Amino acid sequence: MHLPTLLVVLLGCSALAAPFVQQQPLTGPSRHAGPRGKPFTPGHRDPYDGKIDAVGEKLQPLPYRNGDGASMLGPRNRARERQNPDLVRPPSTDHGNMPNMRWSFADSHIRIEEGGWTRQTTIRELPTSKELAGVNMRLDEGVIRELHWHIQAEWAYILEGRVRITALDLEGGSFVDDLEKGELWYFPAGHPHSLQGLSPNGTEFLLIFDDGNFSEDSTFLLTDWLAHTPKDVIAENFRVAPEVFEAIPESEKYIFQGSSPGSIDEEIPKGKGYKRSNLQFAHKMLAQEPINATGGQVRITDSTNFPISKTVAAAHLDIQPGAMREMHWHPNADEWSFFIRGRARVTIFAAEGNARTFDYMAGDVGIVPRNMGHFIENLSDDEPVEVLEIFRAGQFQDFSLFQWLGETPRRMVKDHLFATSPKAGEKFTKAIEDAEKDVIKSQTDFDEDKQEL
């Protein structure tokens, strides 16, 4: 292996390792210290495919890479190009074919209703979204998402504001709770429930359903059912004269302005048959004690700490500026990511030499099929990335590349990666000798203490 090629491999692996305090980063010769020239120009050279924040640095991507490429002469969408710099100028390591793994809610159709709206990302918008579907919903103060149920289970994360949820369990137990930003709810398939915005600006949340074919327009609605049931039957069911039901809606209400709710205690039905549910349908995700990493924080919610959530597991990540969610993969489910804040790039390795890099920003959805290796790198040196990793699974599972190599016999690792350079192999194995998992790795400064291999 030639020295420049060896150094590309060596320094690339080191950048992804982002060592703990006691570890020393791998170093390389100063002549390969970093990229040369202005990004996206014919003279730009970067043998290591470093990140470029086109949006933050106000750069216009062009398909130039290490002496290859040419300018663009035809029609262009410059805003989209800035949002997707790694599609315009892919890293040299990208190769082969891969279906699209990115969708923006900004491209989804919005259904506008009285005091609210909804939009969705399903397998119809993003064909790789096979296991999960997402719905972004907004309810103003007092606005109700009417009483309904689904074929699928519903998991939700509150993005802003406060919301009141109601639900009924299979034992006839009632659940009512007021939730706020950073909290979750989960309704098992078929369980009836409702939602209502509470705070002055209402609420906005992300809904997740455990089937990529889900459609928000195909839910079972109270008003829709009664509008399509003979009033004589309704009267018999509720033991009330048919005339009482002449005032009910003739079609579904779906999202509508409701009356102002009182306190939960004031709203509890007073009938003798009322009982509280023994199930906990809500969870305070952001109140969890975080997993602290060198480059951020992680909170994991699954059936181990939110028992009712049998089909959806999730991780909330805060990735600090310049930091990276380490190279890893998930063995039990596809990853469905929702980016809440910041800008990031993700390279997905699909085996057989196939890899592709996608860029994400707030409001984007990303898919990584199960077992495909990937990372999430914060493109910005100033702004954190906040992202949800969501899975159709009862438990969150992942494998860390760093931990795997750190706990594999050193001889085996060196035989795989550094057979032609024992010195490089020694440096690498020293860097991974503490195999403790570091889920989000802080940015490493490779400009210090340069050494020749």
Predicted regions mapped to residue ranges:
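Fungal secretory targeting signals
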Residues: 1-21
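A short, N-terminal "cap"/entry segment at the start of jelly-roll beta-barrel domains
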Residues: 18-133, 233-316, 320, 326, ...
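Ligand-binding loop in jelly-roll beta-barrel domains
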Residues: 19-23, 180-181, 186-216, 334, ...
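Short acidic-glycine-tyrosine-enriched beta hairpin
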Residues: 129, 139, 155, 169-190, ...
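Structural signal for hydrophobic/aromatic residues that build the beta-strand cores
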Residues: 139, 158-165, 182-187, 195, ...
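Glycine- and acidic-residue-biased ligand/ion/polar-headgroup-sensing regions
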Residues: 141-144, 149-171, 321-324, 329-352, ...
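Intrinsically disordered, low-complexity regions enriched in proline, serine, glycine
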Residues: 147-149, 166-168, 175-176, 207, ...
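Active-site-adjacent segment of 2-oxoglutarate/Fe(II) JmjC oxygenases
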Residues: 202-261, 384-441
